[in-house]
């Protein structure tokens, strides 16, 4: 396949592979290459000389593979309509000024290992491939342990990202759904099993990151309780074991909680630091997230 860019043979996570677009002039025809990120790659923005550029970056260790995507009948028909429109506009122009343009979509992917002949599934949903929390992402977490200086949590999901296929079982997989168990039950059972095995991403909410005011007087025990579902934002990758998270925003904090350390009923936020159970009327302190 002819293209205007020299691709690296081996890639590793974070390695730049190619820009999003490339051009080439061949026999008086402008060829525009549109590089599409495939499995094992991701489109990331970079700053270069004050300009924002988008480039395809590897997320796996393996061999770089690029192949041209075949156009569907609808795309070919649309291109034919665009070319006829351009020809009508260039009737008055001289033949030397008319330049033909061709757009080619190139799928760029990284295959694990070094097998160049290995085939990938083109119909796989790439949204499920890389769902790792990164800086700035909003995540849903569950509190697992408390101390005077911090709250330890486990990350359940990344907001605005699809949930991964749950190992072939449940509504999100290819297996049979158990009676009385829907998608929520299947997802909860899988996350519970992952939690027991210690396979979830872990995070830390430090006392100075709980809220933006009166940081020195924050009492973690009055803001969170074990079992609470907390909406937080990723501050940094942390110490290599735990993500550093923050709830120092009005829309961040506890979204679901139960009274009496999880033994009571579901509570609802009445203000930014108080939750109430509508059944018993019991109130407990929390750092609540603004619901809307």
Swiss-Prot record:
Modified residues (Phosphoserine): 94
Segments passing through the bilayer: none
Disulphide bridges, residue numbers: none
Gene3D superfamilies noted in UniProt: 2.40.50.880, Nucleic acid-binding proteins
The entry's keywords: Cytoplasm, Exosome, Nucleus, Phosphoprotein, RNA-binding, rRNA processing
Recorded superkingdom: Eukaryota
A single BP term in Gene Ontology: mRNA processing
An MF annotation (GO) of this entry: RNA binding
Main location: cytoplasm
Any one cellular-component term (Gene Ontology): cytoplasmic exosome (RNase complex)
Record region (Disordered): 67-98
Subcellular location: Cytoplasm; Nucleus, Nucleolus
Function noted in UniProt: Non-catalytic component of the RNA exosome complex which has 3'->5' exoribonuclease activity and participates in a multitude of cellular RNA processing and degradation events. In the nucleus, the RNA exosome complex is involved in proper maturation of stable RNA species such as rRNA, snRNA and snoRNA, in the elimination of RNA processing by-products and non-coding 'pervasive' transcripts, such as antisense RNA species and cryptic unstable transcripts (CUTs), and of mRNAs with processing defects, thereby limiting or excluding their export to the cytoplasm.
More about this protein: Present with 5550 molecules/cell in log phase SD medium.
Quaternary organization: Component of the RNA exosome complex. Specifically part of the catalytically inactive RNA exosome core complex (Exo-9) which may associate with the catalytic subunits RRP6 and DIS3 in cytoplasmic- and nuclear-specific RNA exosome complex forms. Exo-9 is formed by a hexameric base ring of RNase PH domain-containing subunits and a cap ring consisting of CSL4, RRP4 and RRP40.
UniProt family annotation: Belongs to the CSL4 family.
Official protein name in the record: Exosome complex component CSL4
Gene giving rise to this polypeptide: CSL4
